[in-house]
């Protein structure tokens, strides 16, 4: 059964379809948003062999003309060079402002294609077909698009909402165990930031998600998308509540920068570590009891996930250098670094009242495998 989460943003409202075999139904689902039967698809070298043919068949059966660009897979694709290549592809395909382009892939492709759509002809529409768990529950929803800079991640971009999101649960079967767990880092984040009952549900049903239970996976994606949609509607451009979605990300982005945005640390793995460190920091500040971060770590470890910097298989900089990398975070306001802290599971909030000394002590402990 397909479930639909509606994102009510006025004339930019859209639906998120969650269910099985949505790739096979893509032509019929996309056709109503088209003004002419033509689309341009951008995907990557990992996704194309797995899913591009199926999407093309669905579009062809619906009478929709299409062309595809296949980019290299990996975080390095979120660059000026690949943005330029994508825009050249759209222009060569004569994509007009009223047309639709399709992002078929994980978070990297979704972010890149969304940004290209935002700036092409001052804004063309785009459809997200996320093929990773991380993209289905996070990056494909909410309109954040962008690329990376030398100075940090996601520092160049725009808010540009999709016209439709198709989250096909079946494509998750093609993910490696590591990639699925990386996406789970974003799923568990929703329970930690504002939905304690969902975190409890994950503690019970996490093994079923890993085992491939489609009903459990659909429910996890639905709840995650609904939570994100509710927050985005309240605060589309991250002036308030939406910042809560960055729980764990200040630590995460510094760790990603330190590992060169490479496969030594996947984004969702960094989020999981970041969430564990955010709750550890909260406990050290006296905002919550030590039992809370212990419970968070216990669940992440039970799912086979990284929880500490010492779990990263790479040489890491000193705590002071990691803290300096945090200074490039998007949540810096007037030179002040804001953190997402928590009073309990499901009770996150934004604060700048976190001393450098506390952060350094948390980083140092997390780098020591004896403290894990």
PLM regions and their residue ranges:
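Solvent-exposed alpha-helices and their adjacent loops that cap or buttress functional pockets
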Residues: 8, 34, 94-96, 119-121, ...
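ATP/NTP phosphate-donor binding region
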Residues: 1-100
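C-terminal charged capping/lid subdomain of soluble metabolic enzymes
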Residues: 3, 185-187, 287-372
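A glycine/threonine-rich phosphate-anchoring loop and its flanking beta-alpha core
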Residues: 115-208
């Amino acid at each position: 059964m397909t479930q639909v989460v509606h994102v009510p943003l006025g004339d930019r409202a859209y639906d998120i379809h969650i269910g099985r075999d949505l790739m096979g139904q893509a032509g019929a689902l996309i056709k109503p948003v088209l003004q002419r039967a033509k689309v341009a698809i951008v995907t990557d070298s990992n996704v194309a062999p797995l899913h591009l043919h199926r999407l093309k068949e669905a579009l062809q059966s619906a009478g929709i003309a299409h062309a595809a660009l296949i980019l290299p897979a990996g975080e390095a694709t979120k660059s000026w060079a690949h943005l330029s290549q994508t825009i050249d592809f759209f222009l060569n395909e004569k994509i007009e402002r009223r047309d639709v382009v399709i992002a078929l892939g994980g978070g990297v492709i979704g972010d890149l294609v969304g940004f290209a759509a935002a700036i092409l002809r001052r804004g063309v529409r785009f459809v997200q077909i996320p093929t990773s768990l991380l993209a289905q529950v996070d990056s494909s929803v909410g309109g954040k698009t962008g690329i990376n800079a030398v100075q940090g991640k996601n520092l160049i971009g725009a808010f540009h909402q999709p016209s439709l999101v198709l989250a096909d649960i079946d494509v998750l079967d093609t993910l490696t165990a590591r990639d699925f767990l990386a996406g789970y880092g974003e799923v568990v984040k929703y329970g930690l930031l504002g939905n304690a009952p969902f975190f409890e549900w994950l503690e019970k049903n996490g093994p079923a998600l890993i085992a491939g239970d489609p009903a459990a996976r659909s429910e996890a994606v639905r709840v995650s998308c609904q939570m994100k949609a509710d927050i985005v509607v309240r605060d589309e451009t991250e002036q308030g509540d939406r910042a809560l979605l960055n729980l764990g990300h200040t630590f995460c982005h510094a760790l990603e920068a330190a590992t060169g945005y490479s496969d030594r640390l996947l984004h969702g793995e960094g989020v999981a570590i970041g969430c564990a460190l955010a709750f550890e920091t909260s406990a050290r500040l006296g905002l919550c009891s030590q039992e809370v971060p212990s419970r968070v770590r216990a669940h992440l470890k039970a799912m086979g996930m990284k929880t500490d910097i010492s779990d990263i298989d790479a040489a890491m900089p000193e705590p002071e250098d990691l803290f300096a990398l945090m200074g490039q975070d998007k949540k810096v306001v007037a030179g002040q670094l804001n953190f997402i802290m928590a009073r309990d599971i499901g009770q996150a909030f934004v604060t700048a009242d976190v001393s450098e000394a506390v952060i350094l002590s948390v980083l140092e402990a997390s780098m020591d495998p004896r403290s894990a």
